[in-house]
């Protein structure tokens, strides 16, 4: 799915953490608030049993995994899973909810090739993946895409093969299945990441004219704008500019594609126009007008409306990233954030709304206001440790390394769940090395804590856990370059090796563990 590119490093960590277990699939951690989706009969049992049940009863299987703290997950719970339309449809498939901190989570992540939170996959009754659903679209569009997947004659993978061999054979439904596939969560299953921009560009060019083609065209533009330069296909910038103007000037098209317009405003506007040109001026003016309408659109979720305001900030910073914003825009940010804060009472929804609001304040240069909002939420949130990462990032942005490390430490200390604690700990340790490299004692103490918990974590060397540990290994190796911290480094490495030694020789995790340090 397409998640907005959050400005704070905390959020970048946030939506890409661990994945679920087996036996406790239908259970939330004790710290979670009451279910917003109580009407859904989540399957009680492990994943393999769920697939067997789906096959026996000839039902598709809907697999959702997320985390208690994850803002986009809470957004889905408060805008999709609590909808009567979704609850009614859930009776026609086997719904499986896997919590990200359950013991087999990372191993499942490797099995299903998933990383980001939330990921939602629809499988056929025989266990083949049909599609990955985009969690960033509004609830009505989500239900339409879900219905499309349930009635699809073939998978997105097979549909793509057909599109690449003879696109004339695709039906309008086939094109919609491709257009609304969660390409950001593909993880290279269908298309290698490097090839995605060019692939989407070709699909957009082949798609018949209409709303589906517009969405594919915008998706291709996002992929190109956010790709590494070496992976960017040749793009007709004038055509890209024209596509954006067409969408922005059409209220329905803008509303239908609000996820792209709000999440990637700065990226696509910057890619489709050059700084200081009349084309840039016209595009940004038109963008602002469309975003203003989206921010006022009460049919959108509060989180999406705040995202539209943040997009206005991104547009304003296109040509002057560090410059002051117009006073009117600064005042608008303050007022819209205050309104969203007052009007959002649901705890699930607040986790997403306050996250967006905090980032919007930060992006607007209102660090003190962002801190005030986030600190207030610490008392209210079911997962305050998530917001502590944002507070750390704000302090880091100010250049206050002491305060930043204090918040990273608090976040690690307050975090819950084995996968979450490992990732929060890795983040804290990485920042310690960056911001206080001479503090050997604190670095060793933190590493000892992480390794101590690691020894009791099942499947600790799969997927996101593995990525976090590899990050630690690289950081510490660089930190000790030339033997600058050799005594501490050797003690930490020896302690880590003790974890590796306890793994059975036949366990594939053993080689991964040995390579970390």
Labelled PLM ranges:
Residues 316, 361, 395, 432-433, ...:
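Residue at a conserved register position within TPR or TPR-like alpha-solenoid repeats
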Residues 59-61, 106, 110-122:
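Structural micro-motif
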Residues 114-156:
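Non-catalytic, surface beta->alpha helical segment in thiol-disulfide oxidoreductase systems
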Residues 40-45, 65-66, 83-105:
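Thiol-based oxidoreductase modules, predominantly thioredoxin-like and allied folds used
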Residues 364, 398, 435-437:
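Structural motif corresponding to the intra-repeat A-B loop/turn of tetratricopeptide repeats
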Residues 159-163, 190-207, 231-252, 264, ...:
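Alpha-helical repeat scaffolds
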């Amino acid at each position: 799915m397409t998640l907005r590119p959050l400005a704070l490093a905390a959020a970048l960590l946030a939506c890409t953490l661990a994945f679920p277990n087996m036996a406790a699939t239908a259970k939330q951690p004790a710290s979670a608030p009451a279910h917003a989706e109580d009407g859904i009969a989540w399957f009680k049992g492990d994943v393999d049993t769920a697939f067997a049940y789906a096959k026996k009863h000839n039902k598709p299987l809907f697999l959702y995994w997320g985390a208690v703290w994850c803002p986009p997950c809470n957004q889905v719970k408060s805008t999709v899973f609590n909808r009567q339309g979704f609850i009614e449809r859930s009776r026609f498939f086997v719904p499986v909810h896997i919590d990200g901190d359950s013991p087999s989570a990372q191993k499942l992540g490797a099995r299903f090739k998933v990383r980001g939170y939330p990921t939602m996959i629809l499988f056929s009754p025989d266990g083949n993946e049909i599609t990955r659903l985009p969690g960033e679209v509004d609830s009505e569009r989500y239900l339409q895409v879900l219905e499309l997947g349930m009635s699809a004659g073939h998978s997105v993978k097979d549909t793509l093969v057909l599109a690449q061999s003879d696109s004339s054979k695709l039906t309008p439904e086939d094109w919609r299945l491709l257009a609304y596939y969660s390409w950001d969560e593909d993880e290279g299953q269908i298309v290698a990441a490097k090839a995605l921009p060019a692939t989407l560009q070709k699909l957009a060019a082949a798609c018949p004219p209409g709303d589906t083609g517009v969405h594919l065209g915008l998706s291709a533009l996002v992929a190109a704008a956010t790709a590494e330069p070496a992976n960017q296909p040749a793009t007709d910038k004038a055509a890209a500019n024209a596509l954006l103007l067409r969408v922005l000037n059409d209220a329905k098209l803008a509303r239908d594609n609000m996820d792209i317009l709000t999440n990637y405003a700065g990226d696509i506007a910057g890619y489709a126009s050059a700084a200081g040109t009349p084309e840039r001026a016209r595009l940004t003016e038109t963008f602002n007008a469309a975003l203003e309408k989206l921010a006022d659109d009460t049919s959108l979720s509060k989180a999406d409306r705040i995202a539209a305001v943040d997009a206005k900030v991104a547009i304003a910073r296109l040509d002057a990233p560090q410059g002051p914003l117009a006073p009117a825009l600064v005042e608008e940010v303050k007022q819209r954030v205050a309104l969203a804060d007052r009007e959002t009472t649901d705890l699930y929804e607040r986790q997403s709304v306050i996250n967006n609001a905090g980032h919007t304040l930060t992006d607007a240069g209102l660090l003190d206001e962002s801190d005030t909002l986030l600190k207030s939420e610490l008392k209210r949130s079911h997962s305050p440790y998530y917001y502590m990462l944002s507070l750390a990032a704000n302090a880091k942005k100010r250049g206050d390394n002491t305060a930043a490390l204090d918040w990273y430490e608090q976040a690690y200390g307050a975090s819950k769940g084995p996968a979450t604690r490992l990732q929060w700990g890795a983040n804290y340790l990485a920042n310690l090395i960056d911001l206080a490299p001479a503090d050997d004692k604190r670095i060793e103490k933190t590493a000892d804590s992480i390794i101590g918990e690691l020894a009791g974590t099942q499947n600790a060397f799969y997927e996101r856990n593995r990525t976090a540990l590899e990050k630690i290994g690289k950081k510490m190796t660089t930190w000790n370059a030339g033997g600058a911290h050799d005594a501490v480094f050797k003690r930490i490495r020896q302690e880590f090796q003790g974890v590796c030694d306890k793994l059975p020789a036949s366990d594939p995790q053993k080689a991964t563990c040995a390579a970390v340090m």
